[in-house]
């Protein structure tokens, strides 16, 4: 079947615009060519407890180093923000899904990490976890 040039170009352009994805299970997809996984957690402290949230996040990161590097990075609210940002955020980059899964298993097996989680739950009003695939440029 021979397609007119204009129709062919429309089909090619439409195909290029559709992102490809790989299914990972449980409805999760990762773009083909993803170059890593990023996990972010946001902690919105109860009033007056932002410093304690930061202390416990530091403790959890120290535990992470003892059970399975990396520790990730900790971020704090910047004074010039609009007020919607979390008081404390943590982020860690993993090479792939298997590396993140191994990290999750190490955290789950650590009594020290669970202790930090239990303590943290008493300090925040809201918690969010986000997981992203890093798309190549």
Where are these regions (language model features)?
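Glycine-rich beta-strand-turn "strand-cap" elements at beta-sheet edges
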Residues: 2-3, 7-38, 71-89, 112-137
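Sensory beta-strand/linker motifs that couple input domains to effectors
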Residues: 93
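Short amphipathic alpha-helices within nucleic acid-binding modules
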Residues: 51, 96-106
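Short amphipathic alpha-helical segments
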Residues: 49-74, 108
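Surface-exposed interaction/gating patches
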Residues: 38-46, 50-52
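Hydrophobic pocket/interface hotspot
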Residues: 41, 53, 90, 100
